[in-house]
Amino acid sequence: MALLAAATLNPTTHLSIRSRAGHNSENLWLRSAASSQKSKGRFCNLTVRAGTPSKPAEPIGPVFTKLKPWQIPKRDWFDKDFLFGASTSAYQIEGAWNEDGKGPSTWDHFCHTYPERISDRTNGDVAANSYHLYEEDVKALKDMGMKVYRFSISWSRILPNGTGKPNQKGIDYYNNLINSLIHHGIVPYVTIWHWDTPQALEDKYGGFLNRQIVNDYKHFAKVCFESFGDRVKNWFTFNEPHTYCCFSYGEGIHAPGRCSPGMDCAVPEGDSLREPYTAGHHILLAHAEAVELFKAHYNEHGDSKIGMAFDVMGYEPYQDSFLDDQARERSIDYNLGWFLEPVVRGDYPFSMRSLIGDRLPMFTKEEQEKLASSCDIMGLNYYTSRFSKHVDISSDFTPKLNTDDAYASSETKGSDGNDIGPITGTYWIYMYPKGLTDLLLIMKEKYGNPPIFITENGIADVDSDPTMTDPLDDWKRLDYLQRHISAVKDAIDQGADVRGHFTWGLIDNFEWSLGYSSRFGLVYIDKKDGNKRKLKKSAKWFAKFNSVPKALLKTTNTNNKPAVTASVSL
């Protein structure tokens, strides 16, 4: 229901609202930005007039009605095998950057060499100190009733030089973490690589720009399988390869910080139109080799699963037109299909092959066969959506970044000037739960309905948000998560095979180029009190949400659900 209302601001900023249609008053989350939002899902279009009705309207931004009690998700909406958990990554939380034999990663090097590239000039040297405080992280998971912890392995902690003999103290750390999780009834889901390549390999041959990385990654994966595979039964080979390639080799805002000459980045010695595709190609080849190794030697009982975690963004056409509908399809191809289609059918999307040309590497027939159907499970990391607007394909348009190759711009506002959803405090995240439902249905209808986990989903607290007066009262995060959990349920009800939802993140962490200025955690890290963990409002809600006895939850047989196939519906 679209609600058009007039409101009068009183001195306490309480909004007294009466709708033109005579609807009852609603509690609304308002943001201070001069735009309005047309009805999408549960959002409503509100025009606020301060003063008399005759005064010109001053729209103050997208708003949405507060969820009614019956709209707030309940644990019994999902079957007992559906998994709720939280995610982190090694560099962002562990600290201990040079302790117990760990070698430097590309992120250690990037933060130490180019501190000006981090918004608050911080680094992950200590981070949340999870290397020493991992038991506190496990306790927080237990207190919230979470059943899964998704974390990543630091390549340079267990292989300081990237290759060779493992560092036993690094192995011990992850063994201790895994054992503690299992002792407390929490299932480990392990990401083998989450952006922190050993600096030794970057120095030796250029990291993911060199095909040699494929064999070295395979060795790293083998060490992980051999060291932890007796207890870890769910693996993701790579996390967010799309974002990594674009930010690390296109824009150069993430380690190793490469971009084309003349652009503003740490290392303007690259090629922003080629290197992202080269690095991405080697990531896919490394994934295929690791999966082949895993299935041949480390899953003899057939009880383990392996896949990849993709960063995804939802898209709506900028306006109701054929050209923008096509732009949306290309945007999805470049954002999701770039890495998804090779692991489903063995090659890149047709639109990418057509528009990128010889800058996009080719797979051999053998490589295609290894890649096709190489994921038992898939992770989707979803935060926000955009409008997709067609850009004319002509000789007058010259791409500067690989992201220009889709000939579709990503817009936060539609053709009517309205934002796609309320901004959340984090400058790049506009809340749009429908985008998640739509993506899950795309996975169902176009990609064979694979088993999916929402491996990341959340928003950040930021100091600049005037509504954030108490770091533990993260009411925006709670509302965001409730709406997105509901969006997952909507997709499940329409047949999508979704197996779990993991919030990003478990704890406040080092947020890459944003440093510690964006805090994504369910758990607050008090840096003034020895990195003490404190549950936020959202964490306490999860504790209540997850408290429903398992015996009261329904059971759904997933044994006959379709596996990931090598076919794509076009």
UniProtKB/Swiss-Prot annotation:
Name the top EC class: hydrolase
Reactions catalysed, as given in the entry = Hydrolysis of terminal, non-reducing beta-D-glucosyl residues with release of beta-D-glucose; DIMBOA beta-D-glucoside + H2O = DIMBOA + D-glucose; DIBOA beta-D-glucoside + H2O = DIBOA + D-glucose
* InterPro entries cross-referenced by the UniProt entry: Glyco_hydro_1, Glyco_hydro_1_AS, Glyco_hydro_1_N_CS, Glycoside_hydrolase_SF
Annotated disulfide bonds: C259-C265
List the keywords (alphabetical).
Chloroplast, Disulfide bond, Glycosidase, Hydrolase, Plastid, Transit peptide
Q: What is its EC number?
A: 3.2.1.182, 3.2.1.21
Transit peptide limits = 1-50
Which biological process, per GO, is one annotated for this protein? carbohydrate metabolic process
> What is its subcellular localisation?
Plastid, Chloroplast
Q: Which domain of life is it from?
A: Eukaryota
Annotated binding of a beta-D-glucoside, by residue: Q92, H194, N239, E240, Y383, E456, W504, E511, W512, F520
Residue positions of the active site: E240 (proton donor), E456 (nucleophile)
Under Gene Ontology molecular function, one entry of this record is:
beta-glucosidase activity
Which tissues show it?
Expressed in young seedlings early after germination.
- Give GO cellular component annotations, separated by semicolons: chloroplast
Q: Does the keyword Plastid apply?
A: yes
What does its pH dependence look like? Optimum pH is 5.5.
Q: What other comment is given for this protein? A: Wheat is a hexaploid with three different genomes that contains at least four genes coding for GLU1: GLU1A (AC Q1XIR9), GLU1B (AC Q1XH05), GLU1C (AC Q1XH04) and GLU1D (AC D5MTF8). The monomers can aggregate in diverse combinations, reflecting the several isozymes found in the native enzyme described in PubMed:10750901.
Described purpose of this protein according to its UniProt entry: Acts in defense of young plant parts against pests via the production of hydroxamic acids from hydroxamic acid glucosides. Enzymatic activity is highly correlated with plant growth. The preferred substrate is DIMBOA-beta-D-glucoside.
- Family in the record: Belongs to the glycosyl hydrolase 1 family.
Q: How does it assemble?
A: Homo- and heterohexamers.
What's this protein's name? 4-hydroxy-7-methoxy-3-oxo-3,4-dihydro-2H-1,4-benzoxazin-2-yl glucoside beta-D-glucosidase 1c, chloroplastic
Q: Which gene encodes it?
A: GLU1C
